[in-house]
From Swiss-Prot:
Primary location: virion
Species: Klebsiella phage KN3-1 (Bacteriophage KN3-1)
Role of this protein: Functions as a receptor binding protein (RBP) and probably mediates the attachment to the host capsular exopolysaccharides. Displays a depolymerase activity that specifically degrades the K56-type polysaccharides of Klebsiella pneumoniae capsule, which allows the phage to reach the host cell membrane and bind the entry receptor.
Signal peptide span: none
GO (cellular component) term, any one: virus tail
Protein name per UniProt: Depolymerase 2, capsule K56-specific
Coiled coil feature spans: none
Lineage: Viruses, Duplodnaviria, Heunggongvirae, Uroviricota, Caudoviricetes
Amino acid sequence: MLKTDFNQPKGSTIGVLRDGRTIQQTFDKMRYADTIQELRTMEPVGPRDVATVRRATEDSVLVNAPVYYDKNDTTSPDDGISVFVTAGGARWKFNTFKGYCAGLAGLKEDGSNVTTVVNGIVNRIVAKMVAAGRVNNQQRTVNIPVTGDAPEWKLTGPLVWPTVISLVFHGSVLLDGTSLTAGKILNCNNVPFMDRLTVAIMAAGTNPTDRPGRVNQAVGRAALTCIGGEVTVRLPGTQMDGSNNPTIHTVGAMIGNDAACLLDARDIYFEKFNIIGAKTGIEFGCYNTFMCGVEHFNVSRCYDGFSSPTLGSNYGERMYLRNGTIGNMDRHGAYLVGGGDFTLENVSVDFLGGDLAHFGPLSPAEYKHLSGHIEGVKGSLAAKEMPASYSKALVILGKAVRRDDRVVDQNDYRGVRQLFACPQNPYGRMLKVINESYAPGREGQVPNNPYPCETGWPGNSGVELILPKDTFVDTPYVNSYSPAVRNSVNQTISFTTASTGPLGGNVLSTDYAFAAEIIGGATCSYGTPAEATSDGYMPFIITLSDPSDVVYLFCTNRFRPGSGQSVLWGNCSVTLVGTTGSIILAPVIASYLGTTWTANTTTGAVTATPIRRGIQEGGTVDMSALAAAGGIPNGTYQAMPSRSVQGFYLGCDHAVAGFKITGGTGQVRLKLPVWWFR
């Protein structure tokens, strides 16, 4: 309220508080302490006395922290962060309703003691939890004020705190840990506190009164965040040895329990942070750690982006990475030795020396990249080491994932190559991949790989690759050469040494899997083991004596198209030996509709002969031009880019697929012919 003071010039007013004191009188009563040491020498003068502490120490950050006298408290110990006891036994208290202040605990302006101060506050908070016998309803936030222009603070060791405490930086800061060669630098982990915190303390106050025996543990939520900026941790890198192995072993951010621990790490997340130069950017705990993640993050110049490093227990449910980048890894984007269900949304991956997702031999982990960008992966998009159990790993690349399959430089090869890997093993297909991503950048790329298949050579049979029909925006390729999961219309893709000499000419025969129809002086015969390459597959040997020669190589496995609009795709692996001119390949379909019945009046036998209605030819490929453009020498196999064919007869009884080879002279060696519908 305001009142007129008649002792002052006319019209003057002064403020009056509810207790009758004027504002000036209140200002006159305000007390200041330059340091906490000075505060401890100030005795309260009244039951509602307040004071302001400018700094914790002479060289600490300016905080101007308000404290109040609590006349009812005569027992609380001086904790150095929120309770300060005078010589006369009075308790000055800092109101912690917004959390504890690292500045009031002595954080220096240059941040050189940030490790000591933050870990000290954490230990005092834990002591309060232990004294109270509970985590719930305890203040668990540590506010860390950042001052100055472009602050760069020196870390003297890791920051370590349990998952029920939150670190909140106020302002952007660079935490320089380049002198640290080991350890988990941002270590949100319950294991170091198991000697003090117990399940009973974590669970106190969480259970309904009618079920006192049930255990619900406290959760932490925002374990690391930044208001008004971001936190950057810079570490010394990996410093590879002569065998290309890292000599420095740091983890940028540890989220969860890294050893056996009954204290839950649940529902916690890091946000607004960068990790630069660690061996592992982010490690997720493998013991009682679940529903944890990171948001608005960047991991750069590390050995591995993030990891699940061991097979623990009760962990990995609904882990997530959102709105971030994993870039310039020496090795893998995700290194998953343990389990866990990891979902990536709006995450970009730029340049990896190894694999996008790499699984250990026992890993049952799930890697689900639902949206974002993938670029520059030198290794596989997904790879699993030789499986040692029935532990199937799962990878899902979503429709909103755009890939650029180049490796490093702008002009790098981005065409078809092996993208998924799991070796043949006693347990079956232990890497399952559902790939809905798209890679328009590889259109028009000349193949420099022998196998037109994203699972690579036929021996890579531990992969089950599923390519949903409605997701392609670029040329599709066959999903696998493995007969157990291949989506082709022909189950037979090769022949054995029992097949020798020229191929038979009866496309309707069921005695053999392949047949050839020849126009002109060409020949088509089975290859021999001596003509096989290291994969063991023998080729068909096609010799053209004149550019007008035509060879139709058919697989006699019959199929029936689903509709007249179905598009059949085909590809194979080809090498040219001593050819001239342009060797042209195209997929074809021979359609059969109706039957001619022939009766033998002598024997009474009746023969049924399907009527061929025509051969439809699909898109062509000039393999000679392709080999020249790709620098592929004679005798080296090259993938035929997939081409489609359409136009078979509606309602046809059956069809057979094949390739047409024509256009030049010389020898064409063709192996692994495959045809499939999307």
